[in-house]
């Protein structure tokens, strides 16, 4: 039940450190969960940043599942979902307050939301309310850390300044996680078809009584 509340996609239920490639970033994420009580007490979060497809969301999901296993309340969502959910609501404040009540809030893919004044206002309201709650926040983004630190747009700058105050930047690099998954699937597909063709050929031989030379 907690995972249904936390995640928007069932595939995320199985994201865990045991299945993750052993990297420095993964080790730091594991340390974060192992020291959760201190992280919570000191309001320390993560800013997972880096190129597209390197596994930032997966790492955040691993952290979420590790904490959910300990009955800690976690919500992982993104601003496109938040903005869509809030648009028809008369009481937007209660929605934002509800997000602030989770022991850990994970905001995925910062920077992919709409760039309108309304959307940026919602983003700031959620971040600012979380800031004032004193609870940890994890953010993932494809935006370079340099851009976050040197943003000149006033509305974006106040958002990024809040995040950088709350979250420790952690670079997630290496090869594209999505490309690696696609490559792995392609390899499995080739193996499957090769096995299928071999099996089909053997069946034909058995049925006709012929042999190949």
Task: Give a label for each model feature.
Residues 41-61:
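Walker A/P-loop nucleotide-binding motif
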Residues 43-47, 74, 104, 136:
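Residue-level preference for the first positions of well-ordered beta-strands
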